[in-house]
Amino acid sequence: MKTPAPPPDNADDAAAQRGKIRVSVNLVSVLTSVLDEHNRPAPDLPREAFQIFEEGVEQKLEVFESETQQPLDLALMVDASLSAHKEIAFEEEAASHFIGQVLRPGDRLSVFAISEDVTQLVTYTDDIARLQGAVHRIPNGAGTSIYDGLLLGSRTLEHRGEDRRHVIILVTDAGETTSVADFDAARKGAVRSGSLLYTIVIRPVKNESGRNTAGEHALETITDTMGGAMFYPDTVQELDGIFDRINRELRTQYRLGYYPTPRGPANTYRTIEVKVSGNYQVRHRKTYLTGPQ
């Protein structure tokens, strides 16, 4: 158990401590992925190449980290209905390989199975063997509660601390069937947690008439809002490459931070835009929820 900090020695120390808390709460941190025309990460760009806006008003960039070393908390969410897929072994092996590659000192990962219910198979840990074992034991499920899964994953990440990067990786066929939560609740929960979402859609058929295109479009909207990326592998053999791409992107992210001017009202959604000079593709979360004043 963490030992609580001793009380401040005097009133000046107490005031300084309160000031630090206010500064930490007010800082808006924005993880930003910058890709070149070949969809490769673009590292080593200078601070001067970036502009950040809130509600259309340019903000002063107070924090700039290239290839941020901020530790990761990752929620790996696997659609249990994929367990019936004839090539499930490839999917499990790709996810297992990703777990072994992505975790660095200080990082933590949790595995969730999404069926009619959402089950956290392993809580956040750096125990690679436990995590890989859980991926290989995803049970077959009847329903698919994707929105419930996103909401639960977001809530677990929201309480993991603001000094860490929060990431959800969802592997699914996009066939939402049994959630209690709806689209709006899932998106709001994701925004509140400040998480990035990477969605990998395993399509049982390529023809649109046999796919859940409405589910795919809903996930595209949430993923774009959260600043992540969608992937549609044509074969499960492509999964290794997709997981490697996500890993590279997470290791080459820029972390930007600013203190909003003017500050928005309490508990309201504020839009964010990041611009980078040059011919680049830029991804970042599009909005955040203000805290209490």
List each model region and its residues.
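Scaffold/interface architecture of coatomer-like assemblies
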Residues: M1-Q293
